[in-house]
């Protein structure tokens, strides 16, 4: 399996099969398998890798791929610590072996992912830079349109309550009082000294005595006499 992977890496037509991950916070200890830059530990033997792990104080167990990943992670963490911690008077580091120098030169070309969010507390590992909350306020209601309406009796009672009923009663009482005064006799004084009393009002329901003329009396008398004579003749025929 390692031989096939080594052959693909040496092939000029082979494209890197690494996938980049966008992250807003720095990752201090990434896996070297996600890096597109090949490391120099691939050409070393297992014994050499174990010696290097023993020199750095790392665990010796595992396969060759595990040893390579362990060494690459240690190199990356060392470079990250050097980039974060800055000293005013840097001291020259002791000379390292050619293998360590090559690993450092390879890892310096890796661009570190930084975050725009400031660290608010010690050990803050949050991956959220900012959040946007939706606007939860309800919109204001539109102003009501006032429409004028024609006045009516129900509206007056509903608006003014018992005052409208009291006013209607007063008006009805005043009208009745006026009608009562109009039915009382009124005296009219003339210049000659005569006094005439007149009644004003509705006389349609009053019944009065009407004088009949002479012709009317004769006609009515004739009708009554004819009816009486006819009745008398009928009664006389029944007796016989």
From Swiss-Prot:
The keyword Transmembrane applies. It is a single-pass membrane protein. InterPro entries: SAP_dom, SAP_dom_sf. Residues 1-28 form a transit peptide. The chain crosses the membrane at residues 218-235. It holds the Pfam family SAP. Residues 13-48 are annotated as: Disordered. Keywords: Membrane, Mitochondrion, Transit peptide, Transmembrane, Transmembrane helix. GO terms for cellular component: mitochondrial membrane. The keyword Mitochondrion applies. It comes from the Eukaryota. It is found in: Mitochondrion membrane. Residues 41-75 form the SAP domain. This is Altered inheritance of mitochondria protein 34, mitochondrial. It comes from Yarrowia lipolytica (strain CLIB 122 / E 150) (Yeast).
């Amino acid at each position: 399996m390692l031989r096939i992977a080594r052959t693909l890496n040496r092939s000029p037509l082979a494209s890197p099969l690494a996938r980049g991950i966008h992250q807003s916070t720095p990752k201090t200890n990434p896996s070297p398998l996600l890096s597109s830059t090949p490391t120099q530990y691939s050409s070393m033997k297992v014994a050499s890798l174990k010696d290097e792990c023993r020199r750095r104080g790392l665990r010796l167990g595992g396969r060759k791929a595990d040893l390579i990943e362990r060494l690459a992670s240690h190199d990356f963490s060392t470079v990250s610590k050097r980039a974060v911690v800055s000293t005013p008077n840097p001291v020259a580091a002791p000379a390292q072996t050619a293998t360590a120098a090559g690993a450092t030169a390879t890892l310096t070309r890796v661009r570190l992912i930084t975050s725009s969010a400031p660290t608010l507390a010690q050990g803050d590992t949050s991956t959220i830079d900012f959040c946007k909350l939706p606007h939860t306020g309800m919109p204001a209601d539109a102003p009501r349109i006032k429409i004028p309406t024609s006045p009516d009796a129900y509206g007056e009672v509903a608006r003014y309550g018992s005052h409208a009923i009291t006013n209607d009663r007063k008006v009805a009482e005043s009208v009745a009082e006026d009608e009562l005064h109009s039915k009382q006799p009124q005296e009219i004084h003339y210049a000659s000294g005569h006094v005439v009393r007149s009644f004003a009002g509705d006389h349609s329901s009053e019944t009065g005595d009407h004088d009949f003329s002479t012709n009317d009396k004769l006609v009515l008398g004739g009708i009554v006499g004819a009816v009486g004579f006819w009745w008398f003749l009928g009664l006389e025929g029944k007796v016989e």
